[in-house]
Regions:
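Active-site-adjacent structural elements that line small-molecule/cofactor binding pockets in enzymes
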Residues: 4-318
């Protein structure tokens, strides 16, 4: 189960979900910078402990406006700051375990005090794996170098995975003498399954709006360029500035939508997800599953069956 910071905190929801003894728990993603590395480390340590090692710590930078204006925290430079954050977390984990004293002197985080009474002490499971959300080449390469896994952005296509994600992860991993195959690759999908064409189209339209929403971000324009659709972000932003929400979605025509969205009946979606992500993703996240549950509390079981069917035909690559 992949749980985001959105309205409610990812960590408290992960703690509640830990009561389900057979599911893995991922914060996917939690916003890093507004929380001190010590705060994040303490929460992750406890979640790893209470879940018997089923928790993975997923972190992201968010964007400048949210970090500075919503959280009142520092943002720049996000890439190096995230690298330093991960280094601080690993130093704290080692101090909790008692293998090293806390003495971390990073570019942005300096930590040197952990009295015994304030340390949670060792736990009987490994340190929580640290996964980073990454989009651009620098962040992907850095994640390949320092992280245990990568959260791919929901605005992903096979071309983006092949041309951007995998090559940069390989470059980063090679710097530290490991293979990119050692990394967990967590890929969200705008899967749009349904038992009727109306149900499928409902999720397709939701996906269309999400592609337009994410596609309005200038930093993601290159993903459309890779598809031979230059100028897509500019057209979406023009509609956005005019307050034309329907117009934003209309920029994403059906052919473009199909690059991001896998739709069909439930069985077809399983096959198509498997074909797209087999030998690439170690975990596929069904982006709309939580939304389906929020609308209809009986719907989650059907999405769970889809996930189990996908796992059966596409065993984890890692």
């Amino acid at each position: 189960m992949c749980i985001r910071d959105r309205g409610r905190t990812a960590y408290l929801s992960c703690a509640a979900a830990a009561l389900a003894a057979e599911i893995d728990l991922l914060s996917g993603i939690a916003v890093a910078f507004p929380r001190s590395p010590m705060v994040t480390a303490a929460v992750a340590w406890e979640l790893a402990d209470v879940s018997s090692g089923r928790f993975r710590l997923g972190l992201g930078t968010q964007v400048r406006a949210h970090v500075e204006r919503r959280y009142g925290s520092e943002f720049d430079p996000p890439g190096p700051r995230m690298r330093d954050y991960v280094g601080a977390l690993r130093a704290i984990f080692a101090a909790y375990r008692g293998t090293d004293d806390l003495d971390y002197d990073g570019e942005f985080w300096k930590l040197s005090l952990l009295p015994a009474m304030w340390s949670p002490g060792p736990i009987a499971v490994p340190d929580p794996p640290i996964d980073i959300a990454a989009v651009n080449p620098w962040m992907l390469e850095m994640a390949g170098e320092v992280a245990d896994g990568v959260h791919v952005h929901p605005l992903n296509t096979p071309v983006y995975l092949d041309q951007s994600v995998l090559p940069n992860l390989r470059t980063g991993s090679a710097k530290v003498g490991r293979s990119a195959a050692d990394l967990e690759l967590i890929v969200p999908s705008f899967a749009a399954p349904g038992s009727t064409s109306e149900e499928v189209n409902q999720w397709r339209e939701m996906a269309r709006m999400q592609v337009a929403f994410y596609g309005s971000t200038p930093n993601y324009a290159f993903i459309f360029d890779q598809l031979g659709r230059p100028g897509t972000t500019e057209r979406i932003r023009a509609k956005q500035k005019a307050g034309d929400i329907a117009g934003m979605a209309a920029v994403v025509d059906d052919e473009l939508l199909d690059e991001f969205c896998i739709s069909g009946d439930w069985a077809d979606v399983v096959d198509r997800l498997s074909n797209r992500y087999r030998n690439v993703a170690t975990r596929v996240v069904l982006y709309f599953a939580g939304m389906a549950w929020a609308r209809d509390r009986t719907a989650l079981g059907r999405w769970g069956e889809l996930a189990l069917a996908l796992r059966a035909v596409s065993p984890p690559t890692g």
